[in-house]
Amino acid sequence: MLKGAWQARIVTLFPEAFPGTLGLSLTGKALEMGLWSLETIDLRPFGEGRHRNVDDNPAGGGAGMVLRADIVARALDAASVGTPSERSRWPVVYLSPRGKPFSQAMARDWAGAEGLTLLCGRFEGVDQRVLDAYAVEEVSLGDFVLTGGEIAAQALIDATVRLIPRVLGNHASTEEESFSEGLLEFPQYTRPTVWQDRTIPEVLLSGHHANIARWRRAEAERLTKERRPDLWRAYCAARGRDPDEDREL
C-alpha cells in the first residue's frame, strides 16, 4: 500500500465475500497498485461461547436475531486501531435500509477522507446502543432489503474508490457522468453510425463542440426531469429556475 493511500475496513460475518468484484477491473488494478487498501475484520471470533455466538433474540419479542452490542463493539474497536477518531476523517458506516440514501456527494466526501469503516449487518440488524455509542452513520443503498450488508458495502466502496486520483486514469470521466452536476448523464453512442435503422444523433458527428455540449446538457436535463423529479427540483432550486418551466428539454 502506498503511503497515505485510502483504506477500507469492513466488519463482517463473511470476510470471504471480499474483495469480490472490487478485485476486478480498475478498482482491482488500483488495489494491486496500492492506491487503496482493503481489510476485513471477521465478526465471528469476537462472539461468545463454544459456537462464538454474535446475536440474540430481539428485546420485546419478534422474529429473527439481533447482533449484540458488546460483540459488535469489540469488532469496531479492532477496526479502529490506527485510525483518527474524527468522523470527518474516518467515517464509520452501518449499511441499513433505514439509513440516509447513499449519494454521489457522499462518495466524494468519503473519497476525501483517510478511510472508511463499514459495518455489514445480518439477521434483523444491530443493537441500537452500539450504533449510538460509536457515532455510526446509517446509510442505505436504496428502498429495498438485502440479506446482509456485504453486497451494499462493495457498491459503496466501488463508488468511492473510483473517485480517488489515478484510479480511473481519466479524471474527466467522473466529471461528465451521472450526478456530477446534479443531473443524470446524457445518452452515449458509438460505432456503427447506423444500427438497425437507428442512427447516432447528427449533432454528435458534427465536430462542433459547442453544439455537442449544448445537446448533452439538454439531454441530461430532459432525462433528469423525466426520471428523477427529486433531482430535477434540487437542480433547479440551486439555479433559481422553475422546475415546471418547459425549456425545450
From Swiss-Prot:
The keyword NADP belongs to this UniProt entry's keyword annotation: no
UniProt cross-references to InterPro entries, sorted A to Z: Alpha/beta_knot_MTases, tRNA_m1G_MeTrfase_C_sf, tRNA_m1G_MeTrfase_TrmD, tRNA_m1G_MTases_N, tRNA_MeTrfase_TRMD/TRM10
Catalytic EC class: transferase
A GO CC term attached to the entry: cytosol
Domain of life of the source: Bacteria
GO molecular function: tRNA (guanine(37)-N1)-methyltransferase activity
Assembly behavior: Homodimer.
Protein family per UniProt: Belongs to the RNA methyltransferase TrmD family.
Name of this protein: tRNA (guanine-N(1)-)-methyltransferase
Organism the protein comes from: Cereibacter sphaeroides (strain KD131 / KCTC 12085)
